[in-house]
UniProtKB/Swiss-Prot annotation:
Oligomer and partners: Part of the 50S ribosomal subunit; part of the 5S rRNA/L5/L18/L25 subcomplex. Contacts the 5S and 23S rRNAs.
Gene behind this protein: rplR
GO biological process: translation
Family: Belongs to the universal ribosomal protein uL18 family.
Keyword RNA-binding among record annotations: yes
Organism: Trichormus variabilis (strain ATCC 29413 / PCC 7937)
Protein name: Large ribosomal subunit protein uL18
Length: 120
């Protein structure tokens, strides 16, 4: 029986999470993409603690965007998560794309975070 898109995404997500582990030296930059918004968190998996987060739901970000569901919004979140991470002294991360393909909004966020100074 053919897999649905949802099942394929869940399988990819489990596979990626099996390989990607955040540490205090290199925390995990986890990205979640919904139909309306995009969320990014820098997580230390050993402590189970979120160090930094940014999303298009935040009022200061939401007011400056026409939509939270496009590449422009994703790149703005990528820059914001990088700036907040660098303020906390985090320069190196491990990128966790979740079950999403590295394309479109996910790629825009990753490239913007790299340009803003995060190393991954």
């Amino acid at each position: 029986m053919k897999l649905t898109r949802r099942e394929s995404k869940q399988r990819r997500h489990r596979r990626v999470r099996g390989k990607v582990q955040g540490s205090p030296e290199r925390p995990r930059l986890a990205v979640f993409r919904s139909n309306e918004h995009i969320y990014a968190q820098v997580i230390d998996d050993t402590q189970h603690h979120t160090l930094v987060s940014a999303s298009t739901v935040e009022p200061e970000v939401k007011s400056s965007l026409a939509s939270g569901a496009n590449c422009e919004a994703s790149s703005q979140i990528g820059k914001l998560i990088a700036v907040r991470s660098l303020e906390k002294g985090i320069t190196k991360v491990v990128f966790d794309r979740g079950g999403n393909l590295y394309h479109g909004r996910i790629k825009a966020l990753a490239e913007a975070a790299r340009e803003a100074g995060l190393d991954f």
